[in-house]
Amino acid sequence: MLKYLNARVASSPCLLLVVVLLVLTSSTSCSLFGTHKKVSIPPLLPRVNGTREQMIQEVNRLASIKSIHGKLDIQFEDTSFASFGIAEKYRQVDGNLTLQRPGKIFLALQFTIVDIAQMASDGEHFAVAILQGDEKYKRFVKGTNSAVYSRLDRNGDSAPATNSKQKGEKQTVSALSNLRPQHLTDAFMIRPIDLNAGFIYSLSEFFQEEADTRPNKKGSRVMRGYYLLEELSAPKDGETSVLRRFWFDRVDRIRLARLQTFDGRGQIVTDVSYFDEKPIGSGETVSLPSRIELTRPQDQYKISLSYQDPTSVDLNKDWPPQAFVLQNKWQLPEVDLDAEKPKKLTSNQ
């Protein structure tokens, strides 16, 4: 019998392997499976549950704001070299902002109490006046909101800055020369969700590891839960596309934390993050984000905007149409972007 078993084992490598494994596991099972090592992982923050209807209601609450007027701290980052892990952050400037639905904006920018730029849009067309910096930057630019333009040409020699103030001013003007006023309108004045507009809305959850922003938790990492509410186009030929993606933070309560918009190719047009929600308004207050970060990957910039004094912001005031008209009273050289080349229209600008 022993000879028969030995013969079977010798003739079957698979059977031999099984026998060896049985011997090993029977003699070392305790040490093999009893050994363990504790590792630290980011804790999952407590989260609340919500419904699609609740999130749509929150978007439309924010979208109920008709106008905003207030002073801002604005910081601009040029992300042209983001693929190399480099971004240029420019000096903070002061902004005087007026917004009104639908899509109207006026923004005046100052650097150390000097006017450096003004820009406006009536919802269809925009104008930007660059008032400081090198002569190659001083100009009055006009265009159409729904058009896509390449970055303005910055070629040309410039005189070296004689001090740090001049250097900071030149860098800031250079960075702001390609900012378009209509880029800010949807970030502040979110478009409402209309369930009768033919769009499809899909809800899912998402978990993301990120820095812990709670007090006394500097340097820590946490796992934060989100709801993703996606606005999809009506199906056509069996296909649909994402138009907007709303991120809702689930920690403590349901809060709109991020909004992404997409073009027809599925590429991100705008990526807006909302922070530090608090009562905003000089009279009747509304709970709104007090800091907004807007990233435009295709335009290669990021801009951070914070209210200087949330209690002095005017909400829901009616502004006349002329408040959003910018005239070239400085007699700057004019650049008509529509006249230089045919404009390419897109539906997600």
Regions found by a protein language model. Name each.
Residues 1-11:
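N-terminal secretory signal peptides that target proteins for export/translocation
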Residues 13-27:
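Bacterial N-terminal signal peptides
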Residues 30-90, 168-178, 339-349:
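N-terminal leader/targeting segments and the immediate start of mature chains
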Residues 31-34, 177, 191-194, 198-331, ...:
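Gly/Pro-enriched, hydrophobic low-complexity segments
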Residues 32, 74-126, 132-133, 345-346:
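Post-signal peptide N-terminal segment of secreted/secretory-pathway proteins
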Residues 59-68, 88-90, 98-102, 119-121, ...:
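Edge/loop elements at the starts and ends of beta-strands within beta-rich repeat scaffolds
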Residues 102-183:
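An acidic-aromatic
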